[in-house]
Amino acid sequence: MRFYIKTFGCQMNENDSETMAGLLMKEGFTPASAPEEADVVIINTCAVRRKSEEKAYSELGQMLKIKRKRKLVVGVAGCVAEKEREKLLERGADFVLGTRAVLKVTEAVKRALQGEKVALFEDHLDEYTHELPRIRSSKHHAWVTIIFGCDRFCTYCIVPYTRGREKSRPMEDILEEVRELAKQGYREVTFLGQNVDAYGKDLKDGSSLAKLLEEASKIEGIERIWFLTSYPTDFSDELIEVIARNPKVAKSVHLPVQSGSNRILKLMNRSYTKEEYLALLERIRSKVPDVAISSDIIVGFPTETEEDFMETIDLVEKAQFERLNLAIYSPRKGTVAWKHYKDEVPYEEKVRRMQFLMNLQKRINRKLNERYKGKTVRVIVEAQAKNGLFYGRDIRNKIIAFEGEEWMIGRFADVKIEKITAGPLYGKVVWIEETPSPVSTDK
């Protein structure tokens, strides 16, 4: 029997899909390269925005078209599954897996193959350990989920309702997973969490993200460690110190701000002000001068005025982000904002505001990227792009493209930057690691 998993959304969904694939292969299922070749299709969904939910339903519709022509089991997992539950069975799905029930994927598939309609939502995260089989999408970089859920309850966000409350994995279990990855030749890991900075608070044993980064950096063979996604008020001075002094910890911080207006931040239930956020950036940069800080912003939140938007523009100009993810506000059913705030900003105005910020960020990117011209940076070669060039990222998460060969993938390379754009940088390889082995990760 062959299976195919289509994944939408965040890196945690990607990690969940890797785990589901590993569990299915352990039971004798084999992966298919396309849904047309599969006996079982699983759609791992995202519900963070209306558009992502619509993509999930569109994909379900496409799979049901195939199902009408031949025998096919179709399952839905992820945040849309958790949110819509049994409604998806009514829409034609054969099984539904909640976000904390992905470890029961083989049970769901086997029961569905017998003709049963299956909906599993029970929390099985206590069974989530380093011993789980996983089919990783990369041979040198691995996602490692360290904390599930979120306790922040931002008024626009569906995640606390679909992913549940915060639940940290024991530190030793995470470290054992990283040790196994190192033995398998993995060189980079990214620690994942909806609020990764909250790691360890619920364990009550002194565990923290800062301590985890320090311990993981001692594991031989692991050269770079990343973490996603941070919440400003949970970003500790201890964490800043670790980033500053530990050469294996990436000099890259993703720190969503969402708005520059204090009034809007309060309506969003973000527990900081614009001034406090900018002060945090200053603290980070004072200790880590070469850090690359990226962020997320929502435009068109209910009641956002032109004055509020100007405050956001001011924040972006002062923050000088290396990257900025922009989203138009879309109400998510069940959230506080959906219940209590009228979505009254015209769509055309939301688009105008987003376009303005996109253009502003492009100018900032271009200016910041000029610093790279003529410099030589160290990257891990990741893959070949559609244009034929290869690419990698430096320790600040800057994408560098260059001419290369397939054997280079997974190795360190020094690239001299020759061309600057507002996006990727382009350069020439001046050194390539002969065989993958522990080397300095920064340059």
Curated annotation (Swiss-Prot):
Residues 1-114 form the MTTase N-terminal domain. SUPFAM superfamilies: Radical SAM enzymes. InterPro entries: Elp3/MiaA/NifB-like_rSAM (IPR006638), Methylthiotransferase (IPR005839), Methylthiotransferase_CS (IPR020612), Methylthiotransferase_N (IPR013848), Methylthiotransferase_N_sf (IPR038135), MiaB_methiolase (IPR006463), rSAM (IPR007197), rSAM_horseshoe (IPR023404). The keyword Metal-binding applies. Its EC number is 2.8.4.3. The keyword Metal-binding applies. It catalyses: N(6)-dimethylallyladenosine(37) in tRNA + (sulfur carrier)-SH + AH2 + 2 S-adenosyl-L-methionine = 2-methylsulfanyl-N(6)-dimethylallyladenosine(37) in tRNA + (sulfur carrier)-H + 5'-deoxyadenosine + L-methionine + A + S-adenosyl-L-homocysteine + 2 H(+). It comes from the Bacteria. [4Fe-4S] cluster 2 binds at C150, C154, C157. One of its GO terms (molecular function) is N6-isopentenyladenosine methylthiotransferase activity. CDD domains: Radical_SAM. Residues 136-367 form the Radical SAM core domain. Keywords: 4Fe-4S, Cytoplasm, Iron, Iron-sulfur, Metal-binding, S-adenosyl-L-methionine, Transferase, tRNA processing. One of its GO terms (cellular component) is cytosol. Its cofactor is [4Fe-4S] cluster. [4Fe-4S] cluster 1 binds at C10, C46, C79. Signal peptide: none annotated. Residues 370-431 form the TRAM domain. It holds the Pfam family TRAM. Binds 2 [4Fe-4S] clusters. One cluster is coordinated with 3 cysteines and an exchangeable S-adenosyl-L-methionine. It is found in: Cytoplasm. Belongs to the methylthiotransferase family. MiaB subfamily. Monomer. Catalyzes the methylthiolation of N6-(dimethylallyl)adenosine (i(6)A), leading to the formation of 2-methylthio-N6-(dimethylallyl)adenosine (ms(2)i(6)A) at position 37 in tRNAs that read codons beginning with uridine. This is tRNA-2-methylthio-N(6)-dimethylallyladenosine synthase. The lineage of its organism: Bacteria, Thermotogati, Thermotogota, Thermotogae, Thermotogales. The gene is miaB.
